[in-house]
Amino acid sequence: MSWLFPLAKSASSSAAGSPAGLTSLQQQKQRLIESLRNSHSSIAEIQKDVEYRLPFTVNNLTININILLPPQFPQEKPVISVYPPIRHHLMDSQGLYVTSPLVSNFTMHSDLGKIIQSLLDEFWKNPPVLAPTSTTFPYLYSNPGGMPPYPSQGFPFLPPYPPPEANRNITSLSVADTVSSSTTSYTAAKPVAPSFGILSSLPLPVPTTESSASVNQNGFGYKMPDIPDAFPELSELSVSQLTDMNEQEEVLLEQFLMLPQLKQIITDKEDLVKNIEELARKNLLLEHSLEGKRQTVLDKYELLLQMKSTFEKKMQRQHELSESCSASALQARLKVAAHEAEEESDNIAEDFLEGKTEIDDFLNSFKEKRTICHCRRAKEEKLHQVIAMHSQFHAPL
């Protein structure tokens, strides 16, 4: 009961407050620790003057910064690590320890609070990502496998939809226009075949390479008729007729038109054009239905964006509440509350010693404040033991 004896109290307080009781190294260490506490109110003391922990959240990722002070601190630089391991240019290859120049070049006169603040600013400017081999952080909505929960890119499942063309009329289009428009819309630009009279209206031969296989997969393949190696009809012609055929294109084309293979190709072409026109008409009938479904998809996509934004805000709020209710934060609050109750009890004792309060009032109020102080300290110590025991086998609380 030193508070009952003013001389003993004043002597003990002067001895404790005298800087002569601490070495210059210890005084500098205490100043750096106070700088750290003043700069970051949410920091938690894991072990007095040895280990501190600062949780923070960036991009829905909660990270703990662990600050370990070696025995010869501040002559030795502090060891700053993070959990879970992250990928960042200020971290080592394993993503555990901070390799910032401010930490590497730490001296006795460095400001530890400003160093941690600069580290947080850099994390906010360039957000880190979880290391691929790291375990998930023990929160309810932690993203598995270290994958970011919300990618910043958009939703690529909606292809651009071309505006409908007005006054489209399939019957008014010629075959050449239909083929040219289809080629322009769905394939790359190809060299135009040379025009030689009636040959320009004939279909191009279907290639037999990989492009032919891809066309067949879509159900639009066409097999060319077999071309014979010899034409018996030409053996009946004279040399002069063959010469005229070689020199005159019209005669050569007439001979070609008599070939059964070419007649089959022309017939197949006409059938194919009719099928294309019929399919185009059916597609036009589906235009209004597709427009309605497209608008429905766009409306649902807009609703999805709104729900995504609301979910992200709630997730951020959940992480903030989770941090405020974490074991480290509760321990820090209990410590502050116990210190406040102790100061209030000391003030009550000083008022009693100065004769400002009666003994009955003093006993009631002092006993109440002291009981609160000891209860809070006991809870704080018990919580510290639970955190220390849990950190040995599990992730930090």
Swiss-Prot record:
GO terms for biological process: protein transport; ubiquitin-dependent protein catabolic process via the multivesicular body sorting pathway. Pfam families: Mod_r. Keywords: Endosome, Membrane, Nucleus, Phosphoprotein, Protein transport, Transport. Component of the ESCRT-I complex (endosomal sorting complex required for transport I) which consists of TSG101, VPS28, a VPS37 protein (VPS37A to -D) and MVB12A or MVB12B in a 1:1:1:1 stoichiometry. Interacts with TSG101, VPS28 and HGS. Component of an ESCRT-I complex (endosomal sorting complex required for transport I) which consists of TSG101, VPS28, VPS37A and UBAP1 in a 1:1:1:1 stoichiometry. Belongs to the VPS37 family. The gene is Vps37a. PROSITE patterns: VPS37_C. The keyword Protein transport applies. This is Vacuolar protein sorting-associated protein 37A. GO terms for cellular component: centrosome; cytosol; ESCRT I complex; late endosome membrane; nucleoplasm. It is found in: Late endosome membrane; Nucleus. It is a peripheral membrane protein. Residues 308-397 form the VPS37 C-terminal domain. The modification Phosphoserine is found at S18. It comes from the Eukaryota. Component of the ESCRT-I complex, a regulator of vesicular trafficking process. Required for the sorting of endocytic ubiquitinated cargos into multivesicular bodies. May be involved in cell growth and differentiation.
